[in-house]
Structure formats: structure tokens, C-alpha cells
Design a protein with these regions (language model features):
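Non-catalytic cap/lid and distal C-terminal segments of serine-dependent acyl enzymes
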Residues: 1-183
Length: 183
């Protein structure tokens, strides 16, 4: 989504990257004008990250793979049991957050930076649920990836609260967060 007057102005804009764009992008886009009017929110470019898939089951499999930092064996077993009940669902996978973050940092962001009027020093990540878990994982393992993190209802429960161990490790080596965080 682009701010008003984007095409005629030659200024650089902050950018917000949002995962689960199929579920979140429309609501965010429709809320923006009011939020910007009432809250003096600056104009920015909204980039939705989503999947080209063969349906909701395929989408869920890709989402589970990309937004989770580990293989959660309890969750994986439960998902496989569900798949047996519902039939021909795709193979369950998880633990691809490192690769997904590399893809965002090395492919998506350079593409957006080159193609649009982006302020490279003003980039925000926005994610909910497993997207929130991914945001926390990114914050604690590669905080320089974004200046701000908007994290809604993160799936802290994932893999016996693995993300809390990642946070403890980060806290051992850092006194402050390198970004602004909105939970």
C-alpha cells in the first residue's frame, strides 16, 4: 500500500513489512487513513509478505515452516494427527525462521528498496500469532533487521516457550533493545 501522493512526490518513506498479508493486509490498509488522521501517524509504504499457494492448507504449511524458529515435536505430532482426520493435507514442517529472515533481508528488502522510494533507515516489522513469534525471534537474533517491531499476540507457547530462552540469551549479552517494540 502506498501513501497519498506517492507517485508525484519524490520523498523517501518509511516501510512496514507485514507477514500473513492475506489475513492482515486488508484490515491494515483500511485502518490506515483513520489512524493517520487521529494519531498523527506518518505516511509509509505497507508491504505485505504472503504466499502463492494451492489453498489454505498449503498456506498453513508454508506459514508454519517460515514463521517458527524450531521444530516443536508436540505440535508436529498434533498436526499430523489432525491431518489424518482431515485427509490429504500437505506435509507438516516447521523451524524455517532463519531461512525466512534471510529471504526477507536478502531478497525482499533489496527488491523493495530498489523499486520504491524507501527510507532504508526506517523499517518496521509487523506480525501476529506465529508472525509475532517470528518478530520476537528476529528481534532477539537479528535486531538490526528492523527499527521497530509491532508484535501482536505472539505464539510464545511454541516449543515449550523456546523464545524465552532466546530472549534470556539476548539479555545476557545486551543491556538494551536495538529497536522500538510495540506489543
Amino acid at each position: 500500500g502506498f501513501p497519498p501522493n506517492y507517485s508525484i512526490e519524490n520523498k523517501k518513506y518509511p516501510v512496514v513489512y507485514v507477514t500473513d498479508a492475506g489475513a492482515n493486509f486488508g484490515g491494515l490498509m483500511s485502518s490506515l487513513p483513520l489512524m493517520q488522521l487521529v494519531n498523527d501517524l506518518p505516511h509509509f509504504i505497507l508491504v505485505g509478505i504472503d504466499y502463492v499457494s494451492n489453498g489454505s492448507n498449503d498456506f498453513m504449511s508454508l506459514r508454519n515452516r517460515d514463521l517458527t524458529p524450531t521444530h516443536d515435536s508436540v505440535w508436529m505430532t498434533n498436526q499430523k494427527d489432525l491431518y489424518k482426520i482431515f485427509g490429504d493435507l500437505p506435509e507438516v514442517d516447521a523451524g524455517g525462521a532463519n531461512e525466512f529472515l534471510e529471504f526477507i533481508n536478502n531478497k525482499i528488502k533489496p527488491l523493495i528498496n530498489d523499486k520504491y522510494h524507501i527510507d532504508k533507515s526506517d523499517q518496521t516489522y509487523c506480525g501476529f500469532s506465529l508472525g509475532g513469534l517470528f518478530g520476537l525471534f528476529t528481534l532477539f537474533t537479528s535486531p538490526e533487521s528492523f527499527n521497530r517491531y509491532v508484535i501482536g499476540s505472539p505464539s510464545i507457547w511454541w516449543d515449550d516457550k523456546y523464545i524465552l530462552e532466546v530472549e534470556k540469551e539476548y539479555a545476557k549479552n545486551n543491556k538494551n533493545l536495538a529497536a522500538k517494540v510495540f506489543l
